[in-house]
Amino acid sequence: MDIRSHIRTVPDFPKPGILFYDISTLLAHAEAWKATVEKLAEAVAPHKPDLLVGIESRGFLVAAPLSLALGCGFAMVRKKGKLPGQTIRYTYDLEYGTDTVEIQADAIAPGQRVVVLDDLLATGGTMAAAIHLLRSVGADVTAAAFIMELAFLNGRDRLDVPAEVLISYES
């Protein structure tokens, strides 16, 4: 199954000059989505995760079905103020400002093997922040995984774990 053919590109979204890779068309095609989850399962299984963590919001769509396929738990990293109860947060720098990610304080047991997922690897900033946050609560982050990456942005350079990617766009 050619997963790439099920990902729509939208020029000038969310602003002029940006080419947006939209997975809505992939999600809408049951066989293509199933094949995507199966391929991710093959890539992630060797990292032996106890728990998958999805990054808000499309990372949830990737991590949740994959956790069922691999028989492991699922937790969420969200933007500040979106999770109930006690949370642990990490604030990181963006090109023009800062952002904050959070996880529930009891979401991860110390030493749990974790793979972090998102739909797209671009600059790597959000994933690097999520990995930092997860380690601060005791996770053993063994890998990051994505449906696709914009390889020309060199996001892998910001990660200190293996990055599993199904589709790489070179330009």
UniProtKB/Swiss-Prot annotation:
Statement: the UniProt record of this protein carries the keyword Phosphoprotein: no
E.C. numbers: 2.4.2.7
SUPFAM superfamilies recorded: PRTase-like
Transmembrane segments annotated in the record for this chain: none
Pfam families documented for this protein: Pribosyltran (PF00156)
GO CC list: cytoplasm
Subcellular locations according to the entry: Cytoplasm
Function: Catalyzes a salvage reaction resulting in the formation of AMP, that is energically less costly than de novo synthesis.
Name of the protein in question: Adenine phosphoribosyltransferase
Gene name, Swiss-Prot/TrEMBL: apt
